[in-house]
């Protein structure tokens, strides 16, 4: 990635963490369809690798705005995809994809972070990885910790996430019939891939 700043990438990761951590409320639903978000999406589309994924997400959002009981339907999609058994779902946990659930805990310790007591999910939840990546990108922009140390931890986190993210995204595509979370996960996949290549 060349045109997005470390802070902008951090914001994208934080935003995605929020959307994958809990069902959207009315305020979030209004926000994702707002003019402000359209500007943000326009900025993201200035990065060629992200363009197609952002376009698809915008299409899903446009369809969402005319969906009857959009929030309730999206909540049902969230529940079906992320909270049910793994037979027809895309569980957002590293351990669901035969990955070491302790790896994220080690990465958090290395970053001087810990999970919040307010987040009632296991530490290997996708949102924790994304929050860590957001934190690391913000730290890169601040310059208070040596960039080499932050970048090393960022690469370790991206590598750990990449071990299971493609399968998670494939399952989102397979089981999300409406497609909002499938599009969101595709944007995440492309972002992580670009971030990983930007060594």
From Swiss-Prot:
Instruction: Give the main localization category.
Output: cytoplasm
GO molecular function terms attached to this record: identical protein binding; molybdopterin cofactor binding; peptide binding
Q: Which UniProt keywords apply?
A: Chaperone, Cytoplasm
Location of the protein in the cell = Cytoplasm
Picking any one GO biological process from the record gives: protein complex oligomerization
Q: Which GO terms describe its cellular component?
A: cytoplasm
Task: Answer whether the UniProt record assigns the keyword Chaperone to this protein.
Answer: yes
Q: Which InterPro entries match?
A: Chaperone_TorD, DMSO/NO3_reduct_chaperone, HscB_C_sf, TorD-like_sf, TorD/DmsD_chaperones
Is-annotated flag, keyword Chaperone? Answer: yes
Which family does this protein fall into? Answer: Belongs to the TorD/DmsD family. TorD subfamily.
Q: Which HAMAP family match?
A: TorD (MF_01150)
Q: What does this protein do?
A: Involved in the biogenesis of TorA. Acts on TorA before the insertion of the molybdenum cofactor and, as a result, probably favors a conformation of the apoenzyme that is competent for acquiring the cofactor.
Q: What is this protein called?
A: Chaperone protein TorD
Organism equals Escherichia coli (strain K12)
């Amino acid at each position: 990635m060349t045109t997005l700043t470390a802070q902008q990438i951090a914001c994208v990761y934080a935003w995605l963490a929020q959307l994958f951590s809990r069902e959207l409320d009315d305020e979030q639903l209004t926000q994702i369809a707002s003019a402000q978000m359209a500007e943000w999406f326009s900025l993201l589309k200035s990065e060629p690798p992200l363009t197609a994924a952002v376009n698809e997400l915008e299409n899903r959002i446009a369809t969402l705005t005319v969906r009857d009981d959009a929030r309730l339907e999206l909540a049902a999609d969230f529940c079906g995809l992320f909270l049910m058994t793994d037979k027809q779902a895309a569980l957002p946990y590293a351990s669901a994809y035969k990955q070491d659930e302790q790896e994220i805990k080690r990465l958090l310790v290395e970053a001087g972070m810990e999970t919040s007591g307010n987040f009632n999910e296991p530490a290997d939840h996708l949102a924790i990885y994304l929050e860590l990546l957001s934190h690391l990108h913000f730290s890169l922009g601040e310059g208070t910790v040596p960039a080499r140390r932050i970048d090393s931890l960022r690469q370790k986190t991206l590598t750990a996430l990449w071990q299971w993210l493609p399968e998670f995204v494939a399952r989102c595509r397979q089981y999300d019939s409406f497609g909002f979370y499938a599009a969101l996960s595709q944007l995440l996949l492309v972002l992580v891939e670009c971030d990983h290549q930007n060594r």
